[in-house]
């Protein structure tokens, strides 16, 4: 049974340093989220994240998870697409015992920032295609994790060949553009997401860096036409994970759909 830990910060006065009280309870005592009748909801995102081990999940990753829950419950399609795309991206980074790198994420972030500045989308199309392939790899990892939680404990995440393992990219420029394009339903949540992702980007450990890059890249890709094409397949995978269904079958179908989308990216 998984523990649920509540951290309570208490300050006895305005000038006093806060004290910390930790209460541990069984997660089974916490009421699960209830679906809202739509295919995409906070219940879907929340249950999908239950497959990953919480040992490497720091407070900023938990913050991201709650933001994704809130985005999934928004009434607009872009917020829901963002929640699903970023959930798959983050779950892939949390699936393996040893972090990989974020070369594809860094490439799509840099290409997006450059395209906003220059108006040239040619490099962005290639980068989006490569990142969709990375999402396909993430789906494979999610499928393995759902089938056997111990199967990836000693495995490493995807490796690539890029400077610094994809830990350095145009973070601020990309998020400036993402925030400028946010709609009224999501602007507050996107700003919260930016703040949490920034802490992950500046963290010393590669797991946090990878999740920060995944969330940032997901925010970029979710705005493209390709995201709408792959969205149903991503939802099917998360639904199978959440329901304890045939994740392998959903992952196989999603892999084909993502391969087709990657081969036909249009911006």
Swiss-Prot record:
Partially N-terminally processed to yield a short form which lacks the first two residues of the long form. The interchain disulfide bridge is essential for the intracellular transport and secretion of fibroin. It is found in: Secreted. Produced exclusively in the posterior (PSG) section of silk glands, which are essentially modified salivary glands. One of its GO terms (cellular component) is extracellular region. It comes from the Eukaryota. It holds the Pfam family L-fibroin. Disulfide bonds join 103-162. Its main location: secreted. Residues 1-16 form the signal peptide. Silk fibroin elementary unit consists in a disulfide-linked heavy and light chain and a p25 glycoprotein in molar ratios of 6:6:1. This results in a complex of approximately 2.3 MDa. This is Fibroin light chain. It comes from Galleria mellonella (Greater wax moth). The gene is FIBL.
């Amino acid at each position: 049974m998984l523990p649920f830990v509540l951290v309570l910060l208490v300050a006895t006065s305005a000038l006093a340093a806060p004290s910390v009280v930790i209460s541990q309870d069984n997660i089974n005592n916490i009421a699960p989220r209830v679906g809202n009748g739509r295919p995409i909801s906070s219940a879907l995102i929340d249950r999908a994240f239950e497959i990953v081990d919480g040992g490497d999940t720091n407070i900023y990753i938990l913050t991201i998870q709650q933001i994704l829950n809130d985005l999934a419950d928004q009434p607009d399609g872009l917020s829901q697409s963002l929640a699903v795309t970023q959930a798959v991206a983050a779950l892939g980074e949390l699936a393996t015992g040893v972090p990989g790198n974020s070369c594809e994420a860094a490439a799509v972030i840099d290409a997006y920032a450059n395209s906003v500045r220059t108006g040239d989308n040619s490099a962005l199309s290639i980068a989006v295609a490569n990142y969709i392939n990375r999402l396909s790899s993430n789906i494979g990892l999610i499928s393995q994790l759902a089938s056997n939680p111990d199967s990836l404990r000693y495995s490493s995440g995807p490796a690539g060949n890029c400077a610094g393992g994809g830990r350095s990219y145009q973070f601020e420029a990309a998020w400036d553009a993402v925030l400028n394009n946010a709609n009224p339903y999501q602007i507050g949540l996107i700003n919260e997401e930016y703040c949490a992702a920034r802490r992950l980007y500046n963290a010393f450990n590669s797991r946090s860096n990878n999740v920060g890059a995944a969330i940032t890249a997901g925010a970029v890709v979710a705005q493209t036409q390709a995201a709408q094409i792959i969205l149903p397949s991503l939802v099917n995978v998360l639904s199978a994970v959440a329901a304890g269904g045939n994740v392998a079958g959903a992952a196989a179908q999603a892999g084909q759909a993502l391969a087709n989308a990657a081969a036909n990216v249009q911006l």
